[in-house]
UniProtKB/Swiss-Prot annotation:
Its main location: membrane. This is Macrolide export ATP-binding/permease protein MacB. Part of the tripartite efflux system MacAB-TolC. MacB is a non-canonical ABC transporter that contains transmembrane domains (TMD), which form a pore in the inner membrane, and an ATP-binding domain (NBD), which is responsible for energy generation. Confers resistance against macrolides. It holds the Pfam family FtsX.
Length: 648
């Protein structure tokens, strides 16, 4: 009869300092299918090491171990995990149930790693628990089960994938006598159903219930009677077979890893929340700085645009402060007409100005009188509170009309509802008020002088007596590049004058400078926020490293029931990612709350959350989870199952 399990000259030694300590010495053993074997020996005799080798949790240092004719030394770690998953079922003295799972969920674990569909494995788990008398304890956590009930759950878990070979390590060691008898009765029933049952024990009463007792002492077998041939029932419990396609197996595996990660997080709510806190603060900081910073930038740029950022000012001379008499009369009315004919010009206005006294009744105030065209207010995007600007006829006739700014109106007419039609004196010339304009803020701050505007022809001929212009302001059409417009303007006037006796000031350069400055500031603040996110990620890594240490035995249990190293890596990596993703979602919610509160106190701010910002936040949190979760996950996947199971 061919042996199911066969050890030939197997030895196992472990390093101890510079020496090797032999635990098993030249073991040769055959165990046939359907046997019930007891391995006995005193503590330290090597029986647990022998069981670990039989269960493919450990490999011999020398010698050969075959399972159903397959030499396990030729198998890689994934193949060994598959062998454990499909052929072996473990029953431990301390049950080794996962405390955050129910009885049914504990039983399902081997089938999860076998890739069995959820409905099939749930039905299988309930069937096994029903057979073992636990139908009313299916949804109970281990803490609500007695020792005997927990061991029966452990037996059901061992049978989940078929359990051709049952390895029971001191299965009654932690039970009272009655519960111990029940467990042994179940093991005998499994033997009768065709399972191979191997019991490791030091209790002679337990060993006596086996058909064959193998005694081990100081790493050597000292008693090994031959196997007894008996006719038994045929048909070991059939495992639930996975017939799903490869992509569906992968999707199912990922979904189950996600579910297990969520359960593990829920089992330690406070620790999970504290772990998330760093990510929440980091993501909230990044998102808040991006969206609030963008809102602040747009507000600043809007204020700058309101001053007329698509305007170009033309002044006589070489630069500001140049009072050379030969350049003073450089700009003429004909230059204005030529500029207005250019296709890229929206509007243009001349400007001549002088400080004068403005009088109405007994009120006498100083004002800055500006001679402009009717397009001036369009060039600077100014609106009217009352009345309107002067028209072409009034400009041509040098009409004695004036537009006041809001501050001037308030000084002259504090109690009048409508001032259009009132007559005031500008210098010594009477003029009629035809409008009140809302003045836009200046790039250089608001002057303390009050402003009034008259037709430039009126200002030049009637008040100043000059034929030249102090400056010309050009508004460029929307969509036209301001720099190119400035170059064309310079060429036009240079050709007209025969020389460059003027200079230009492009307000678009102010906008570009402001954009660059705000971008630099926002980038700096974002980098500061990213540092907080990195600190949060390091916190996740620290907690996950602690979690791996705390859950070492859990990792050993999962490997014993068939989890591959990649399964463990995937689970812990998903846990880290899930912590960061949930933390990222909470961080985004916090940033939205911050934005809402800011809008309550700063109603002028328009804070919006773009899909790009939200997607970037989730990508950041996912990347953080992968980056800082990989090291703990790798450490978990590299654990030796024997060492992991031995940890307290």
């Amino acid at each position: 009869m061919t042996a199911l399990l066969e050890l030939c000259n197997v030895s196992r030694s472990y390093p101890s300092g510079e020496e090797q300590v032999a635990v098993l010495k030249d073991i040769s053993l055959q165990i046939h299918a359907g046997e019930m074997v007891a391995i006995v020996g005193v503590s330290g005799s090597g029986k647990s090491t022998l069981m670990n080798i039989l269960g493919c949790l450990d490999k011999p240092t020398s010698g050969t171990y075959r399972v159903a004719g397959r030499d396990v030394s030729t198998l890689d770690p994934d193949a060994l995990a598959q062998l454990r998953r499909e052929h072996f079922g473990f029953i431990f003295q301390r049950y080794h149930l996962l405390s955050h799972l129910t009885a049914a969920q504990n039983v399902e674990i081997p089938a999860v790693y076998a890739g069995i569909e959820r409905k099939k494995r749930q039905a299988r788990a309930r069937e096994l628990l029903l057979r073992l008398g636990l139908s009313d304890r299916v949804d109970y956590p281990p803490s609500q089960l007695s020792g005997g009930q927990q061991q029966r759950v452990s037996i059901a878990r061992a049978l989940m994938n078929g359990g051709q070979v049952i390895l029971a390590d001191e299965p009654t060691g932690a039970l009272d006598s009655h519960s111990g008898e029940e467990v042994m009765a179940i093991l005998r029933q499994l033997r009768d159903r065709g399972h191979t049952v191997i019991i490791v024990t030091h209790d002679p009463l337990i060993a006596a219930q086996a058909e064959r007792i193998i005694e081990i002492h100081d790493g050597k077998i000292v008693h090994n009677p031959p196997a007894q041939e008996k006719k038994r029932e045929q048909g070991v419990d059939a495992a639930v077979v996975n017939t799903a396609p490869g992509w569906r197996q992968f999707a199912s595996s990922f979904r189950e890893a996600l579910s297990m990660a969520w359960l593990a997080m829920a089992a330690n709510k406070m620790r999970t929340l504290l772990t998330m806190l760093g990510i929440i603060i980091g993501i909230a900081s990044v998102v808040s700085i991006v969206v609030v910073g963008d809102a602040a930038k747009q507000m600043v740029l809007a204020d700058i645009r309101a001053m007329g950022t698509n305007t170009i000012d033309i002044h006589p001379g070489k630069d500001f402060g140049d009072d050379n008499p030969q350049y003073r009369q450089a700009l003429k009315y004909d230059d204005l007409v030529a500029i207005q004919k250019q296709p890229w010009v929206n509007s243009a206005t001349p400007s001549v100005s002088k400080s004068l006294r403005l009088r109405y009744g007994n009120i006498d105030i100083a004002v800055n009188a500006n001679g402009v065209s009717g397009d001036y207010f369009n060039v600077y995007g100014m609106s009217f509170r009352e009345g309107n600007t002067f028209n072409a006829v009034q400009q041509q006739d040098r009409a004695q009309v004036v537009v006041l700014d809001a501050n001037t109106r308030r000084q002259l007419f504090p109690n009048k509802a409508n001032v259009v039609g009132e007559v005031v004196l500008v210098g010594n010339m009477p003029v009629i008020v035809i409008g009140v304009a809302e003045e836009k803020p200046s790039m250089y701050g608001n002057s303390n002088l009050l402003q009034v505007w008259l037709p430039y022809s009126t200002m030049s001929d009637r008040i100043m007596g000059q034929s030249w212009l102090n400056s010309i302001t050009v508004r460029v059409k929307d969509g036209v590049d301001s720099d190119q417009a400035e170059q064309q303007l310079t060429r036009l006037l240079t050709l007209r004058h025969g020389k460059k006796d003027f200079f230009t000031w492009n307000m678009d350069s102010v906008l570009k400078t402001a954009e660059k400055t705000t971008y630099t500031l926002q980038l700096f603040l974002t980098l500061v926020a990213v540092i907080s996110l990195v600190v949060g990620g390091i916190g996740v890594m620290n907690i996950m490293l602690v979690s791996v240490t705390e859950r070492t035995r859990e990792i050993g249990i999962r490997m014993a029931v068939g989890a591959r190293a990649s399964d463990v890596l995937q689970q812990f990596l998903i846990e880290a990612m899930l912590v960061c993703l949930v933390g990222g979602a909470l961080g985004i919610s916090l940033s939205m709350f911050i934005a809402f509160m800011l809008q309550l106190f700063l109603p002028g701010w328009e804070i919006g959350f773009s899909l790009t910002a939200l997607a970037s936040a989730f990508l950041c949190s996912t990347f953080t989870g992968i980056l800082f979760g990989w090291l703990p996950a790798r450490n978990a996947a590299r654990l030796d199952p024997v060492d992991a199971l031995a940890r307290e």
